[in-house]
Regions:
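Structured, active/binding-site neighborhoods that engage oxygen-rich ligands
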Residues: 1-301
């Protein structure tokens, strides 16, 4: 199957956001306020991380299969990890992906994490925006496919719900291409309304109620911005940021960055959602030039 334009746009945006955000980890907290105020991008090169590596696996999987085939996808994630394990994977994912790669059943591996609770990290959410764009014609399918891909690495319901939320937001952004974008509260409320009772849903509802004049720092304080590397601490803020800037990918990235936190992942999520609507329109040419290239197959699908 061929990838849709919104899917590839979302992938390109996600990779740009990932690399853009990750580059700011080299800025000290003392230097950060002035650097952010000046809005000077960090020097090249911008390398992408596990967010993009796993999104690439997911998109290639959809091209080959048309839907999520969990056993195959789990093996493909493990294979990518084995090939480039230095892409800054989260602490728990090293063991998960090594064990799957060694032949263990992904269901057993993921369910054993954290005393049988499973990981509720943001890893399933960080990679999923292109999937939302792929299935954007049917929001029920978006939710189900996002859940299936999440479960291959993350057993905890909050991690799964975070992935579903991001995929739904990307789908709604993709559906709005060429028309009026949904308002921030409108998009966040629509996404939250399709989620099960969870901390992620509560965070999105809180985000939808924040006044229009809310500063980024206040939103990050209220919602969290990934300092805990969890889905509830990451997804509501990233989607709040994206939903307020659906017509400007650069503005979405600068705004998301102001929240600090897990910057590669919050920026990857926000950019993956916004780019499902805008592509890289409006992005300074120097930014994609600074970003590490994606594999050649991306241009062929």
């Amino acid at each position: 199957m061929r990838a849709t334009v919104p899917t590839l746009d979302s992938l390109q945006g996600l990779a740009l956001g990932d690399a853009f955000g990750d580059r700011w980890f080299s800025v000290s907290p003392d230097e950060a306020p002035a650097a952010l105020a000046a809005r000077l991008p960090r020097p090249a090169p911008w390398h992408w991380t596990d967010d993009t590596a796993m999104a690439l696996v997911l998109v290639r999987h959809l091209v080959h299969n048309g839907e999520v085939v969990q056993d195959a996808l789990a093996r493909e994630f493990a294979g990518e990890y084995a090939a480039e394990y230095g892409r800054k994977y989260g602490p728990s994912m090293h063991g998960v992906l090594r064990d799957i790669g060694a032949g263990a059943d992904w269901r057993t591996v993921t369910a054993q994490q954290f005393g049988g609770q499973g990981s509720y990290g943001n890893g399933a959410a960080m990679r999923v925006a292109p999937l939302g764009a792929w299935f954007s014609d049917d929001l029920d399918t978006v939710a189900r496919q996002a859940e299936l891909q999440a479960l291959t690495t993350h057993f905890h319901p909050e991690a799964v719900t975070g992935a579903v939320a991001v995929a739904l937001a990307a789908a709604l952004a993709a559906r709005s291409r060429g028309g009026r974008p949904p308002g921030r509260a409108e998009l966040l409320t629509e996404v939250a309304g399709r989620l099960p009772d969870s901390d992620v849903r509560s965070g999105l509802r809180t985000a939808a109620r924040l006044p229009g004049h809310t500063t980024v720092r206040h939103a990050a304080t209220v919602l969290g911005s990934g300092f805990q590397i969890s889905a509830p601490d990451t997804v509501p803020f990233a989607l709040w940021s994206a939903a307020g800037q659906l017509d400007s990918l650069p503005e979405a990235l600068w705004q998301t960055l102001e929240g600090w936190g897990d910057m590669d992942t919050t920026c990857a999520i926000a950019a993956g959602v916004v780019a499902a609507r805008t592509g890289l329109t409006g992005v300074p040419a120097a930014w994609p030039a600074a970003r590490e290239d994606l594999p050649g197959w991306v241009a062929e699908v």
